[in-house]
Amino acid sequence: MSIEFKNVDYVYAPGTPFQTQGLIDISFKIEKGSFVAIAGHTGSGKSTLMQHFDGLLLPSKGEITVAGEQINANTSSKALKAIRKKVGLVFQFPENQLFEETVLKDVMFGPLNFGFSEQKAKEQAVEWIKKVGLSEDMMDKSPFELSGGQMRRVAIAGVMAYEPEILCLDEPAAGLDPEGQKQMFEIFKEYQRAGHTVILISHNMDDISEYADDMLVLDHGHLIKHASPQEIFSDQEWVKKHYLDEPATSRLTRELQKGGFQFSEMPLTIESLVSKVANELKKKGDMDE
């Protein structure tokens, strides 16, 4: 088991006039090595939930287990450091986690902070700077001289350089062009294939349907659905009711069904849809012979 929540509540500004319930009685389990998407409309609690994974926020009530480590309302700062070595969090706004004077130093910070030698930290940083698509001539530049998309790549490299067991990503493709988005998601998927757990917050249902194998849907601090993307996107009425967008493949599949195509299950990628359509056409061709 990678992550387990048991009856978790989170309250912002408790005991003040600004008290707000951020999470309400949340319980779920995430298996090690899975790619999990967190979806829901703005203000549903997605980022609040993710910030509990590394103890950036502590639950007001309930218990969390992350990679064998326990988190509750009384977890100490010392215990949290062990958790944060196992959980890497990339924020929605990369400028919030960049602070060093050069790109290389910024990406080295995580490995150094978690006990890597100077040489090993530099090797890891250089490797991941290249993996996320940045050139070597950027390593000595200030991260604040870069474009928004480049800053996002630096922030991602800075977390992945110490190779945490669990990688948490809050809208990681924002600010990237379509080619850059695909490149980054392939990196995340490869990271999952290497045995790590990847957790994604995204408003883009196409990304979720293509890359995730598990999905949590939040609404006003409640967990209202925990299922596979295939199960969730197969229920068009439920998706509409909870203000989620349908992936493009789901919409296209429904149009094909209106034209007489039959699918035993909802294809979630263009590749799988093309394959299923080709099989249907072949069956029809065989029947006509």
From Swiss-Prot:
GO molecular function list: ATP binding; ATP hydrolysis activity; ATPase-coupled transmembrane transporter activity
Subcellular locations according to the entry: Cell membrane
Limits of the ABC transporter domain: 3-245
Keywords assigned: ATP-binding, Cell membrane, Membrane, Nucleotide-binding, Translocase, Transport
Protein name: Energy-coupling factor transporter ATP-binding protein EcfA2
Enzyme Commission number: 7.-.-.-
Keyword Nucleotide-binding among UniProt keywords: yes
Known partners and oligomeric status: Forms a stable energy-coupling factor (ECF) transporter complex composed of 2 membrane-embedded substrate-binding proteins (S component), 2 ATP-binding proteins (A component) and 2 transmembrane proteins (T component).
A family per Pfam: ABC_tran
Organism of provenance: Lactobacillus johnsonii (strain CNCM I-12250 / La1 / NCC 533)
Transport found in the keyword field: yes
Region forming the signal peptide: none
